[in-house]
């Protein structure tokens, strides 16, 4: 088995009484697009700074390709960082910006020229080497910053929220650019973001962080569909969180009491015990709405009324208030020609989902 490129072992970083990173351990593989995801203050940027060498852990160790990085200065690590601010020299051309770290390292001019040319090709800016940064779009400037980081051929590229300053359309375009670039150059990317959609779109694996700890480390599809905690379910995308109590366990099915709604079946996802408090996490797109629902033993359904709706173009978000006052968010596609919405505010509906559409987590 190939050893991991990066090993983070029991790393802790404190600032006075505040623990920014709390006993974090994880491994990152060669060629992986790995994302540290979490809200502000969760510790993701502090962890990134320790990987770069800008900060040091109070305890634990960080190993890159087997080497302990303790005491290794940032400029001596085979690691480069791309920041949100680009940090380009305004008085230098694009090519000169990219060449700068090579000149500082004393690389021969002939090799500098060849590597700058290749870096420009890698980021699809081969014809922009003579331009000044002010003559480029925001997305192009970000690509120059990435090219400058890649030109030294690092083993590891760290990206600290590099797309957050771009508008929504450009962010989507740059996400595709980053995916293609990472595949082309084969360098391991460690990406920091608070944007859940960005993390889901870009990553091979995601570490969801909360209060200095890793709450879940999995592939994007697993994190979205099978969150391990209430926090992960709530933080990743839209999710209905229904408090419940385990009533009985029968093989792979669990009978739960949805407080105020009654007993329903759900798929067993942890070693649930009768009487244990739990939360049914249910994505809005898993719920269907109808004026009436035909009884089905594998479905859960409740009566309610459309309380609010939000037209989003390709889908409409319906807020359905159930008979006990609980509210469910439901997403339905707007696929009917000439009809934007299926229901209006005030319409009586039934909300239904398959028993295995939700995912149970401990309360």
Curated annotation (Swiss-Prot):
GO terms for molecular function: ABC-type polyamine transporter activity; ATP binding; ATP hydrolysis activity. InterPro entries: AAA+_ATPase, ABC_SmlMolc_Importer, ABC_transporter-like_ATP-bd, ABC_transporter-like_CS, Mo/tungstate-bd_C_term_dom, P-loop_NTPase, PotA-like, Transp-assoc_OB_typ2. It is found in: Cell inner membrane. ATP binds at residues 38-45. GO terms for cellular component: ATP-binding cassette (ABC) transporter complex. Keywords: ATP-binding, Cell inner membrane, Cell membrane, Membrane, Nucleotide-binding, Translocase, Transport. Its EC number is 7.6.2.11. It catalyses: ATP + H2O + polyamine-[polyamine-binding protein]Side 1 = ADP + phosphate + polyamineSide 2 + [polyamine-binding protein]Side 1. Residues 6-236 form the ABC transporter domain. NCBIfam families: potA. The complex is composed of two ATP-binding proteins (PotA), two transmembrane proteins (PotB and PotC) and a solute-binding protein (PotD). Part of the ABC transporter complex PotABCD involved in spermidine/putrescine import. Responsible for energy coupling to the transport system. Belongs to the ABC transporter superfamily. Spermidine/putrescine importer (TC 3.A.1.11.1) family. This is Spermidine/putrescine import ATP-binding protein PotA 2. It comes from Pseudomonas aeruginosa (strain ATCC 15692 / DSM 22644 / CIP 104116 / JCM 14847 / LMG 12228 / 1C / PRS 101 / PAO1). The gene is potA2.
């Amino acid at each position: 088995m190939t050893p991991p490129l990066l090993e983070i072992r029991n790393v802790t970083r404190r600032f006075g009484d505040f623990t920014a990173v709390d006993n974090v351990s994880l491994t990152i593989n060669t060629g992986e697009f790995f994302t540290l995801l979490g809200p502000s203050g969760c510790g993701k940027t502090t962890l990134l700074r320790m990987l770069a060498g800008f900060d040091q852990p109070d305890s634990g160790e960080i190993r890159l390709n087997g080497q302990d990085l303790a005491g290794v200065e940032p400029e001596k690590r085979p690691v480069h960082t791309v920041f949100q601010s680009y940090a380009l020299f305004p008085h230098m051309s694009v090519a000169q910006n990219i060449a700068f770290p090579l000149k500082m390292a004393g690389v021969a001019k002939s090799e500098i020229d060849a590597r700058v040319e290749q870096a420009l090709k890698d980021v699809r800016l081969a014809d922009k080497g003579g331009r000044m940064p002010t003559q480029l779009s925001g997305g192009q400037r970000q690509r120059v910053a990435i090219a400058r980081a890649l030109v030294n051929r690092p083993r590891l590229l760290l990206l600290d929220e590099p797309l957050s300053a771009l508008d929504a359309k450009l962010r989507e375009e740059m996400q595709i650019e980053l995916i293609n670039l990472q595949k082309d150059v084969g360098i391991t990317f460690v990406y920091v973001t608070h944007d859940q959609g960005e993390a889901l779109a870009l990553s091979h694996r995601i570490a969801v962080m909360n209060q200095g700890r890793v709450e879940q480390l999995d592939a994007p599809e697993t994190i979205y569909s099978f969150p391990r905690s209430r926090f992960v379910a709530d933080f990743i995308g839209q999710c209905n969180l229904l408090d419940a109590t385990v009533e009985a366990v029968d093989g792979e099915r669990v009978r739960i009491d949805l407080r105020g709604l009654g007993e329903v079946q759900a798929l067993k996802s942890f070693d649930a015990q009768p009487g244990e408090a739990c939360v049914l996490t249910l994505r809005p797109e898993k719920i269907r709405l109808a004026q009436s629902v035909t009884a089905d033993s594998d479905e859960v359904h409740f009566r309610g009324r459309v309380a609010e709706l939000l037209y989003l173009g390709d889908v409409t978000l319906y807020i359905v208030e159930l008979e006990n006052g609980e509210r469910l968010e439901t997403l339905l596609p707007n696929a009917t020609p000439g009809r934007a919405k299926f229901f209006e505010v005030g319409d009586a509906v039934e909300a239904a989902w398959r028993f295995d559409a939700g995912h149970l987590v401990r309360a």
